[in-house]
Every structure is written in structure tokens, then in C-alpha cells.
């Protein structure tokens, strides 16, 4: 809110304007929806989304798109935020066009976790919105182990968790789950869409495009 909110909005809009493959003549982001902030590696991370329009194919009418990404900064204990960074992209795959969706997810890798004997994982910023009723909390689970969780705020959430676990035997990928206030699971989504299974048995997976 206030001047700081305006500063964050300006940084995010600048990142949106710098998207390399944004179609020429696209309408920039309108009102920005902010997701709960989380802290990791000495920085504060605030995901964001906003609507706009773009001409996806020459000679066609503009269609709605969603801008998505985050603003990140360092918050010293006794001074103003500094070292602002932002990332943005866009998609024309929207939740409003997919009534079967239960969770609207976005994600971006923001770092790497390195363990012993070459073990590693992608530290991933995950944000989204519950599209089912009565959702109270969200969890990120890796191999059925909860690695982050948080209550929802206005049906929105932000998590930071390790994903794409490697060199632990079987690879591990995050599952995002919604829960009601009584601890009943309401929905479950992966960050990945399994396209095919190659002959060697390893699933060929592709990240879902975030949408709202």
C-alpha cells in the first residue's frame, strides 16, 4: 500500500514491459494482484499477477493475457528496502477458461539447494489461488513429506520449497495440496504436466504455464 506499493508496482510493470517475446502492441498490466510475501536467502519475495491483452496471431483480435512473476528485495532491519529485482512473463492460458482447474499455480526457480554426494534440488517460489470452496491452508509435499505450508490469505498463497530432487535414487517432484480447516484434503496439483514416458521409463515433464 501507499508509496511502497506504488514502487513495487512500478518495478513489476517495468519487468513486464521487458518480456522478450511479448507481442507488439500488447496492453500492459492493469491492476496488480499481490500474493503473500515469503523470505529466503536474505531476500523478501512477493509474487504478482495482472491482466492485459495481446494480439497472439497477426490479423486476429486482442485476447486476454495474464502477466505473472515476482518482485524481490533485501529488507535491512533498520533501513529501507534495497536491491530490488523482478521477473515477469505472460500466458494466454487462463483459469477462467479452464473450469476444471482446482488450483491456479505459478512457479519460478529462484535458487539451488546442494547436499552431499551431488544431491541437489531447485529452490522454487510457488504461488497461486484456490479455485475450490472452503480452502484454508496449502502445503508443498516432496515424496509425501511436507516441505512448506501456510494458511491462505484471501484464497491466495505463496510457498518456497525444494523441487526436482536429483541424485537421491528416484527423482522427486513437488505436489501442492489444499486443505480445509478440519485437515481434509480438497485438491492436489503438480507443478508439471506429464507429456509422455520415454522407453527408459523416465517421465518427460513440462512445467505448467501459470495462469489466473
What are these regions (language model features)?
Residues 1, 9, 40-41, 50-54, ...:
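N-terminal non-globular leader segments, chiefly Sec-dependent signal peptides
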Residues 1-32, 136-138:
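Short, non-transmembrane alpha-helical segments in secretory-pathway proteins
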Residues 12-20, 43-116:
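A general sequence property marking short-to-moderate contiguous segments
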Residues 24-41, 110-117:
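Short amphipathic beta-strand and strand-loop transition segments with alternating hydrophobic
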Residues 46-48, 83-86, 126, 159-160, ...:
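Generic recognition of long tandem-repeat/solenoid scaffolds
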Residues 119-200:
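Ser/Thr-rich low-complexity repeats and stalk/linker segments
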Residues 196-212:
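Low-complexity, Pro/Ser/Thr- and charge-rich linker/hinge segments at domain boundaries
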Amino acid at each position: 500500500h501507499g508509496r511502497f506499493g506504488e514502487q513495487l508496482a512500478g518495478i513489476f510493470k517495468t519487468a513486464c514491459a521487458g518480456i522478450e517475446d511479448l507481442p507488439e502492441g500488447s496492453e500492459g498490466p492493469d491492476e496488480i494482484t499481490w500474493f503473500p510475501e515469503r523470505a529466503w536467502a536474505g531476500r523478501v519475495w512477493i509474487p504478482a499477477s495482472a491482466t492485459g491483452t495481446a494480439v497472439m496471431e497477426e490479423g486476429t483480435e486482442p485476447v486476454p493475457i495474464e502477466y505473472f512473476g515476482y518482485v524481490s528485495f533485501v529488507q535491512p532491519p533498520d533501513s529501507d528496502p534495497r536491491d530490488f529485482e523482478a521477473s515477469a512473463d505472460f500466458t494466454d492460458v487462463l483459469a477462467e477458461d479452464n473450469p476444471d482447474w482446482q488450483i491456479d499455480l505459478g512457479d519460478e526457480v529462484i535458487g539451488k539447494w546442494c547436499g552431499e554426494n551431488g544431491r541437489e534440488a531447485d529452490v522454487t517460489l510457488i504461488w497461486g489461488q484456490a479455485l475450490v470452496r472452503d480452502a484454508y491452508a496449502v502445503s508443498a509435499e516432496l515424496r509425501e513429506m511436507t516441505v512448506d505450508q501456510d494458511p491462505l490469505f484471501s484464497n491466495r498463497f505463496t510457498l518456497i520449497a525444494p523441487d526436482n530432487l536429483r541424485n537421491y535414487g528416484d527423482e522427486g517432484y513437488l505436489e501442492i495440496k489444499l486443505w480445509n480447516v478440519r485437515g481434509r484434503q480438497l485438491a492436489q496439483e503438480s507443478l508439471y504436466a506429464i507429456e509422455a514416458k520415454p522407453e527408459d521409463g523416465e517421465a518427460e515433464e513440462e512445467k505448467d504455464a501459470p495462469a489466473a
